Amino acid sequence: KEFPTLSIVGEVWSAHNQPPIGNYWQQSTTNKDGYSSQIEHIMDIPLWENATQAFKNNDAQKLYYTLSQDFVYEHPEKNFGILGNHDMERFFTTVDSNVAKYKLGIIFLATTNRIPQLYYGDEFGMTGKKNKDDGYVRADMPGGWDGDAKNIFNGNGFAESDKEMGLLRFNQEIWNWRKKQAVIHNGSMKHFYPKQGVYIYQRSLNNQKVIVVLNLKNEKIIINQTDYAEILKGLAANNVQFISENTTVNATTIDLPAYGYIILQSN
């Protein structure tokens, strides 16, 4: 009563192919044994495991097959989507410090039908591998302590051309855009079986539409818009390119560079 908007998150660990285990612990689930955890949100560990491996190994099918199991959850949109946390190898390390793969992961996290959680430091590509203990993935935030030689909060010690600053600016653009998108917060999700390593999905809410195209392959791919006519019809005339790097939208195709992406938003 005192905190009506306060939510509790359950850290439910289940393997990549076990969404039903996670669903058991979600508050709204109707369990046969009558149990209700009263936990509204759970960490989506199956999605974390499959998504991180999808971007590491260029395997778009892992994304598709994982989200195809959303029917198991009564409210998949209430799950926490993560690319890592304090108990896991950092995402930038998982993708072998590949900036292009990292960006695909961030875009997916920001636009899929989950509540995104970004682990501190991942917004500028902190690395950390679980070797002897968890300390390797829980390093100090640069600038979080007096006397730090580098400070990510004000940029001291970093050049604007540094990798860290580039990733930080990228994240600022993505997440500030997301703040204003009700279609991403509350919209439905429609996705398509990947072709040529390209994963395409659409978020819809009333007349608002956002289309996300991710090329998980290390090669240029040309998408024929007629293959996705139900969401891409009239794309060039009726949609605007919002976020992209070196991706071209033509009258009938979308030309994606290696690890290319584009977010399209209806006018």
Q: Residue ranges of each PLM-predicted region?
A:
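Active-site-proximal helices and loops of the catalytic beta/alpha 8
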Residues: 1-74, 79, 98, 108, ...
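Proline-centered flexible-loop/turn and helix-kink motifs
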Residues: 1-4, 84, 114
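Active-site clefts of carbohydrate-active enzymes
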Residues: 76-97
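Substrate-binding cleft of secreted/luminal carbohydrate-active enzymes
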Residues: 109, 113-127
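Surface beta-strand/loop "capping" patches
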Residues: 187-206
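Asparagine-centered strand-capping/turn motif at beta-strand->loop junctions
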Residues: 213-217
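Beta-strand-rich binding/interaction modules
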Residues: 220-244
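C-terminal beta-strand-rich structural cap/linker in extracellular carbohydrate-active enzymes
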Residues: 249-267
